[in-house]
């Protein structure tokens, strides 16, 4: 289930490659441990070991050719390093953080647990020395859910499409 590592890796250009080529620092923060890694649309599945170097549903980057070829695997770090970097003012120019299952807001996880986790991530930056020059782009990977309980209005045969929430948080927003 999950990412099939027996097939060829991803050979297309990704954002990390473009950042690397432009000499823009980046990091991808994740939680280690055992996480559900469901194939397709399965609701339940066995947990798989997740780590910085192991591709999986929460960490696709080790499967990208450019991440390996450009020696960027070290940019994939555990989330505890995010909190340390935020406190010390040493976050890279671009950071991504992916949750683990208990804080992902995916069923059966509690939404309040996910919201508390996101709040801790944001507060870490706000309380750090880089807050004055930081913008946080918060988005979710799914549409629907509890935040959007009404179908978008029908304007034509195509429609607006499904809505995915996004927030920009900064001293200037």
Regions inferred by a protein language model and the residue ranges of each:
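N-terminal pro-sequences and low-complexity stem/linker regions of secreted or lumenal proteins
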Residues: 1-173
């Amino acid at each position: 289930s999950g990412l099939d590592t027996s097939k060829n890796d991803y050979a297309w250009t990704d954002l990390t490659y473009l950042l690397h080529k432009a000499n823009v620092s980046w990091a991808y923060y994740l939680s280690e441990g055992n996480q559900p890694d469901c194939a397709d649309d399965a609701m339940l599945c066995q947990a798989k070991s997740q780590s910085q170097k192991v591709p999986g549903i929460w960490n696709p980057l080790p499967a990208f050719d450019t991440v390996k070829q450009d020696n960027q695997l070290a940019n994939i770090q555990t989330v505890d390093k995010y909190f340390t970097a935020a406190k010390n003012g040493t976050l890279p120019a671009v950071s991504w953080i992916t949750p683990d299952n208990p804080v992902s807001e995916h069923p059966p996880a509690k939404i309040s647990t996910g919201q508390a986790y996101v709040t801790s991530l944001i507060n870490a930056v706000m309380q750090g020395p880089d807050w004055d020059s930081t913008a946080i782009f918060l988005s979710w990977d799914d549409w629907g859910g509890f935040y959007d309980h009404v179908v978008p209005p029908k304007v034509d045969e195509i429609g607006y499409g499904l809505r995915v929430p996004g927030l920009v948080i900064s001293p200037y927003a």
